[in-house]
Design a protein with these regions (language model features):
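Transmembrane helix-loop junctions in multi-pass membrane proteins
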Residues: 5, 36-39, 79-84, 160-173, ...
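Membrane-interface loop-to-helix entry segments
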Residues: 24-31, 39-48, 170-177, 200-262, ...
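N-terminal alpha-helical transmembrane segments of multi-pass membrane transport
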Residues: 1-78, 88-95, 106, 421, ...
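Helix-loop-helix module between adjacent transmembrane segments
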Residues: 28-33, 73, 102-127, 134, ...
Length: 469
């Protein structure tokens, strides 16, 4: 039964992430990169400066840095640790190349999303800011396109409830905790007859995680932002430090690893023994898992950007852009290099977080238990903040769909918390396939909007920097 369902999901995933969507996402990023004159290179130093510098006397609910941390809390998660591993194992080392290439173009995409979110945001009757693709589709493209805005919002709820927001994150947390405390599944319990047996560590993790998530979500966006501002920078620095140590310890192997990555991206037969189709798999998995990780083109980050305290759309666009740089070009690259350098992607029988754990155990000059513990800690907190960020995103999507009915949002919040509870009991492959499917469906209406509104982005950008000069 489960194998039939899994095969069906894989076929749907391959259809959604076929050539048309891949071309749409890459071409959209390329178009914006060209029209903005490589803005992601020219203005990156300024963007990094503004990332930590608050704007005075600006409208909004939270600071630009808090908005970025909220966005990063939703992006830096299992995608950086587990997603990279699954991409490299499925598509070969070449998947890492396409992940970084998509992220470079995605920086222009993320900039455009942040700019449009602030430009077209509105203020709700209770005073909180509302914005995102559904508003810039409706207001920027016109009322005739409201159906596209609703389609985006619907898939946004699905991604939060079944994809990035819950199942993949809590599944990753449970796998990491189980791998550290009970790797041999020696202590199992039976929850329900149809669920089978699960390690006690998985059961306890699901209970504790559910309680912690519920405690934070009840406080709304400001509590989510407060938690994210503390947790995200600290854990990102910790993970960066340990991954960097691994790279430095294997620095002599880096040229060979880069050669393998680039070669596999274009002629994967030499690496995987595949044909031309294998190159497409590398591109498919690299782009899909890259979007899972950095969310450029997905349309989620502009929902948080709309709440930022800023009066300049361009400024928030630049701050939003740094999220993709930090998430994929820095953190995912470190993870991918670690996996390739240690050969973890070639070890049979490993999947998901086990691949990255193996890489850390083999590549770091510390006892395996220490390496595993650090990775588990990073994954738990990364995934926890992602769960929080995606609840905010999906609630705003539902708020738009329901015409501002906050009663529906409150009911949804408890359904979301229940989804967190059941996530650990799903299989790794099913979790990631479902996430990929809904990501693609959510990205489609957003990318159509970015193509249509690219002229607005260029006009706003030129006007802003002309005023600054």
């Amino acid at each position: 039964m489960w194998s039939v369902i899994n095969d069906f999901l894989v076929n749907v995933d391959n259809f959604v992430w076929g050539v048309p969507l891949m071309v749409l996402i890459m071409a959209g990023g390329l178009l914006l990169t060209v029209r903005l004159g490589l803005l992601q290179i020219r203005k990156l130093p300024l963007a990094l400066k503004w990332m930590i510098q608050n704007e005075e006397e600006a409208e909004g609910e939270i600071s630009s840095f808090a908005a970025l941390c909220t966005a990063l809390s939703a992006t830096i998660g299992t995608g950086n640790i587990v997603g990279v591993a699954t991409a490299v194992c499925a598509g070969g080392p070449g998947a890492l190349f396409w992940m970084v290439a998509a992220a470079f173009l995605g920086m222009a995409t993320k900039y455009s999303e942040g700019l449009l979110a602030v430009k077209y945001r509105i203020v709700a009757p209770d005073g909180h800011s509302l914005g995102g693709p559904f508003y810039y589709i409706e207001q920027g493209m016109g009322k005739n396109w409201k159906w596209l805005a609703k389609l985006f919002a619907f898939f946004g709820v699905c991604v939060g409830l079944f994809g990035i927001g819950t199942f993949s994150q809590v599944n990753g947390i449970a796998s990491a905790i189980n791998g550290f405390f009970d790797p041999d599944n020696a202590h199992c319990v039976k929850i329900l007859p149809f669920l089978g047996e699960y390690s006690w560590s998985v059961v306890i993790a699901s209970l504790i995680l559910t309680v912690c998530v519920a405690a934070v979500l009840i406080g709304g966006v400001k509590r989510i932002a407060s938690v994210s501002q503390i947790v995200v920078p600290f854990m990102a620095i910790l993970y960066f430090a340990f991954a960097s140590i691994l790279i430095i310890c294997n620095i002599t192997e880096i040229p060979a690893a880069i050669k393998v990555i680039v070669t596999a991206a274009f002629t994967p037969k030499a690496v995987t023994g595949g044909t031309v189709g294998s190159m497409f798999v590398a591109m498919q998995k690299g782009v899909a898992r890259g979007i899972f990780s950095n969310e450029a083109g997905l349309g989620s980050a502009p929902i948080a950007a709309a709440a930022a305290q800023t009066k300049e759309p361009v400024r928030q666009g630049l701050v939003s852009m740094t999220g993709t740089f930090i998430d994929t070009i820095v953190i995912c690259t470190l993870t991918g290099l670690s996996i390739v350098l240690t050969g973890a992607w070639q070890v049979e029988g490993l999947e998901g977080v086990e691949v990255t754990t193996y890489a850390f155990q083999q590549g770091l000059p510390f006892p395996p238990a220490v390496s595993s513990f650090v990775l588990m800690l990073c994954l738990v907190f990364f995934a926890f903040t992602t769960i929080l960020g995606w609840d905010y995103y999906s609630e705003r999507c539902l708020e738009y769909l329901s015409g501002g009915n906050l009663k529906h949002v409150k009911v949804y919040r408890w359904i979301y918390i229940f989804a967190v509870f059941i996530g650990p009991y799903m299989t790794v492959s099913a979790v990631w396939t479902i996430a990929d499917i809904f990501n693609g469906l959510m990205a489609l209406p957003n990318m159509i909007a970015l193509f249509a509104l690219s002229g607005v982005v260029v006009k706003e950008t030129k006007a802003f920097f002309k005023k600054q000069s």
